[in-house]
């Protein structure tokens, strides 16, 4: 069954309806879906063309009749990411991205085969939650005034504002899914990646809550890195999963210099977005990187890259990411 979002939805429904209720309801009913890349506006323009992704402003406050670049009539109002919208509406809290090298694929590193990880990225919180206030708006001014006058913070008055929520619930269910995967696949470790040395009450809390969940629910199956050295002199006991953590910027170095020390990664939203793409670059690029957005009831599989309108009709874009995402989907539903 084909359902619509983005350009195909605009063609079918019109009226700026780019994420129809029919689409949401169908995914909820069928429980599993796979989608292609969707255009996401980047800047502060009023409109975006869904054919060539050109962002543009209206004329005298009116919608352009045609795209200023390609002439398409499929120009719609600026919108937040449809990918983020789908994840939040359907509560697809785990973005799951396996990264490995395939024999013969050209790569920028000497030993791409050493990297074989699966990234569990929290999908609904962090700075990607979409709680933003544009610079100069009344809402932004209210928040800035509150932060300065009530909270005693120093902040420039001409700032845009974004909120970074990270919750106990969101963290623990993500880490739980990562540990369960490690158990099911007999993988040696789960690494919590965070920037808790700077953001102590969000990313630092993510780290702490992750360890807390591991000890509460998997005490007989896990050992922390601290326990490994304090109690076992660094010698890994048989049958245990190692729970460890790394600072986010250090982790980018680790996957390059010590890639074979990592198997499952659990991380907040922004870190996971950056890290999974960086890992994909080590093994040949995003064209070979599949992905899934998984909740407790619904799973949505996708290519991890965005749209590339400039390559339309040129027969040169790598379809492997979407094909491999299809393989993930078939494994998820138990068909292979």
PLM features: residue spans?
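Short linker/helix segments within small regulatory modules
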Residues: 57-66
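Solvent-exposed alpha-helices and their adjacent loops that cap or buttress functional pockets
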Residues: 25-27, 59, 88-89, 108-113, ...
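A structured beta-alpha segment of the ubiquitous adenosine-cofactor-binding alpha/beta core
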Residues: 11-25, 29, 222-262
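Glycine-rich phosphate/nucleotide-binding loop
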Residues: 9-12, 252-336
